[in-house]
């Protein structure tokens, strides 16, 4: 499935900012992607030193900051995003989704839609890059909406998509 339609979305701001980073990738081997490392510097996270360290939370934090919101404390920990914004029962465009992962860790990204069984998640460190992946709905532990400063953007909505593409089972 192609997600090119996301480039035409005018909001919410987190989706617009996330799409600017689409396709950012880890560098294979000993080297690191300086773009990913710069996100940590911009956020003041001095202990983040290499892109082989899980960076889904780093991606969400830089997007949230650039969209004008305050990231959560210890933003690299995916499960900490359960405290961001307001809890929702239905995921809509731009909502932050927090997932479980084997071993007790988590994963975090932005909702761009859903099919019958999966959320379509725009996130970092999904196959070592920023892209959209299908993640099983039953792994989602939190749906969080940005704390809009004026009003919710008019295009924040539920987006139903076709069940197309591989199912992500381990986002590291």
Question: Model features per residue range: what roles?
Answer:
Residues 2, 36, 52, 73-81, ...:
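Intrinsically disordered regions, especially transient/low-confidence alpha-helical propensity segments
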Residues 1-69, 152-172:
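N-terminal capping segments
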Residues 42-47, 84-89, 146:
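Short alpha-helical interface elements
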Residues 7-12, 61, 69-131:
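...with weaker cross-activation on analogous glycine-rich loops/strands in unrelated enzymes
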Residues 133-161:
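Intrinsically disordered, low-complexity, charged/polar segments
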Residues 30-53, 100-141:
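Glycine-rich catalytic cores of cysteine/serine-nucleophile enzymes that process amide/ester linkages
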């Amino acid at each position: 499935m192609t997600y090119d339609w996301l480039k035409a979305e005018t909001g919410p701001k987190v989706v617009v900012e996330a799409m600017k980073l689409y396709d950012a990738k880890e560098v294979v081997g000993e080297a690191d992607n300086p773009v990913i490392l710069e996100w940590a510097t911009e956020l003041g996270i001095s202990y983040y030193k290499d892109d082989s360290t899980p960076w889904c939370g780093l991606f969400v934090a830089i997007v949230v900051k650039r969209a004008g919101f305050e990231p959560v404390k210890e933003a690299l920990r995916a499960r900490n995003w359960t405290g961001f914004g307001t809890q929702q029962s239905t995921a809509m465009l731009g909502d932050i989704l927090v997932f479980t992962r084997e071993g007790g860790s988590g994963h975090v990204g932005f909702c761009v839609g859903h099919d019958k069984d999966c959320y379509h998640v725009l996130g970092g460190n999904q196959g070592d890059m920023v892209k959209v992946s299908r993640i099983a709905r039953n792994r989602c532990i939190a749906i969080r909406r940005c704390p809009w400063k004026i009003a919710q953007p008019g295009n924040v909505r539920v987006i139903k998509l076709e069940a197309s593409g591989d199912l992500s089972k381990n986002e590291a």
